[in-house]
């Protein structure tokens, strides 16, 4: 995970970074190593970046990592009612999202999560930064909704969850999240 000591720089990093954005180490022994943004952790304001294990072995605290932030403001042609956030357009294209005969977008999610299982992150002022957690200790819910089988990169539908202007419950709304 990465974080700038400068609060305003870190807020910009958290706000503008999108999953799938390219990241490159530009100082230190791992200079030139490339990775990509995988998410954020709002509680500690860290941007999460994947690098190969051998590159991580050459990194040290204080190395500078350049994130090519791209994707906030992404729009889907013909679907002005859909709000995209926090995703690199190149990654978005790889998700296999299709438009059906009725003009409705179909997203290949692996499961649906009901609003009552969404926890930490609810009530945040914006969904453009931070994270949003599926939270349950209920073994039956874990099995019923396939939570126990989720993997990094899986797409999930969040039922009755609206993230347009912060995170909130809104009956009949849907949000798509990436694990």
Tell where the protein language model's regions lie, with residue ranges.
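Conserved mixed alpha/beta catalytic, RNA-binding, or beta-rich assembly cores of soluble enzyme
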Residues: 1-179
